[in-house]
Amino acid sequence: MSQKGKNKKWRSAGLYALLAIVLISLATTFLGNRPPERLEISYSDLISRVERGEVSKVLVETAPDGRQVAIAEAEINNRATQVQVNLPPLTPEFENTLVANGVELAVRPVQEEGLLGRILSTFFLPVLLLLGLFFLLRRAQNGPGSQALNFGKSRARVQMEPKTQITFNDVAGIDQAKLELAEVVDFLKNSERFTALGAKIPRGVLLVGPPGTGKTLLARAVAGEAGVPFFSISGSEFVEMFVGVGASRVRDLFEQAKQNAPCIVFIDEIDAVGRQRGAGLGGGNDEREQTLNQLLTEMDGFEGNSGIIVIAATNRPDVLDAALLRPGRFDRQVTVDRPDFQGRLEILKVHARGKTLSADVDLEKLARRTPGFTGADLANLLNEAAILAARRNLTEISMDEINDAVDRVLAGPEKKDRLMSERRKELVAYHEAGHALVGSLLPNYDPIQKVTIIPRGQAGGLTWFMPSDDDMGLTTRAHLKNMMTVALGGRVAEEVVYGESEITTGAASDLQQVARIARNMVTRFGMSDRLGNVALGRQYANIFLGREIAAERDFSEETAALIDEEVRRLVNEAYQRATYLIRENRALLDRIARRLVEAETIDGEELQAIIDNSEVVMLPPEEEPEPLTLPMAVNAGA
């Protein structure tokens, strides 16, 4: 534990101890010093009780002023009671009466305190302790890092000097976004160069992109490079259970920023506070909307915020309020997308620093194997590989650990404890061999990386393809048809080898994928000859954003029936192509399946060697076999 943590712990313990002492002192003062209750009687009544034998002891107290008081222990109503009597000056007759009746007599002086002494003894210690407790609470409240009672204060972390130890050299693969933010930092450092041309500093920069692409990392790099105060806060930290806290924290944040201008304010996950106002089924959220209104005012309201640059990050730009996105508030919207091949290679090089890699590790090959991976995915991938190497008591990270880490990240860990019967192993082998065979024989399809029958996650076996990211997200009609054909290869292999009555549920996810692709081809991509180049059906939107209350079907029942027919036609064509390839290459299918049963995993090079050493029948280049009319369980709503 740090010294600061120890001091805070001891301070808390001291607070509780002081509070306990105060409570005990107050209880002692007001409860412990109460004198016993006494019954006051007359002098003659006392003499009568002494003569009747009801008094056993008399204590005579003499005050400094000469006044005497007798305190007697008498029995009244069959109960022992203390009585008090104001006495005249003592006479021998009173003493003789007491002695004659066997009453014990004692005399003592009374030491009375003055008024000031009584006040001090009664109130001084409690008041002193309460004052000490008050000052201790004030000190704890205003201490560093303590927000015990300051609900309306901003919780932003402030860096007056760079402390993140991260610079733009640690950011790779997102060069365009890095350039935009580097320009903002340069504006703060060398503003004269820009103002000489009449340029104004941008008010805000919004970083938009999928999770894990490096938005927060960019902000940390800005904090390390800027050379100006850097305030960082999460959007969720503005709103609490108390009304008005969010707006108060926004005001306090920008008040601190104005005092330290020029500076940078970074708001992470701004969608937590910047959602559209008054949207959704449940109406608006008054507290969040009040916070958003205050944020809008501070960013570009009646009073300027010159010298303050707001950088915000979100992966949900579609839910943000339009007033927040306009120029003057967020002048720049920087898209931080998934990296391409070159970006992935640079990211891998950055995260490979400090890791001991063996000579066989090829980062370029790994970058080609991981299209669609974000920077966070790649960092996690190399970390998993390092953990696997340590688990295996190795001194270096080899390509085997990296390959296993890729499989682990994509599909989960191997289920080595799951014992499979020979029948199940053979069935899974034929299913995966069907995918691999069809994918290998289709023209211009993605190359196969690996085929395995070792279960991972929810899958009993997997066939890994290596998609290319050169097409920039564009997919052709031919490739979509090939995707459906490959997905149906496993079901067709089961049917060809074991018969229609022995097909299994292992193709459930394949059928869902096929139905989804076919329906999108018909209704979204305009790839149906009968329906033409039209997009049918309004797309679903998140109903809690106020965009759509329900999906609307903008076509007739006849068109809906035609859509179903076209979906079934596309699926049947893909099924027919897969059936043709597997029936015509049955011997090759058996060879691949037998090898899978033996080795459990074969890589793409070994699979290609098996295909090269076998007789192969390809699809006819011009005409395809007649479509088969087969009953298929196609989820038309997928």
Swiss-Prot record:
CC terms in the record's Gene Ontology section: plasma membrane-derived thylakoid membrane
Free-text remark on how the cofactor is bound: Binds 1 zinc ion per subunit.
EC assignment: 3.4.24.-
PROSITE patterns in the cross-refs: AAA
Residues in compartment: Cytoplasmic: 1-11, 136-638
Principal subcellular localisation of the protein: membrane
Assigned protein family: In the central section; belongs to the AAA ATPase family.
Protein's recorded name: ATP-dependent zinc metalloprotease FtsH
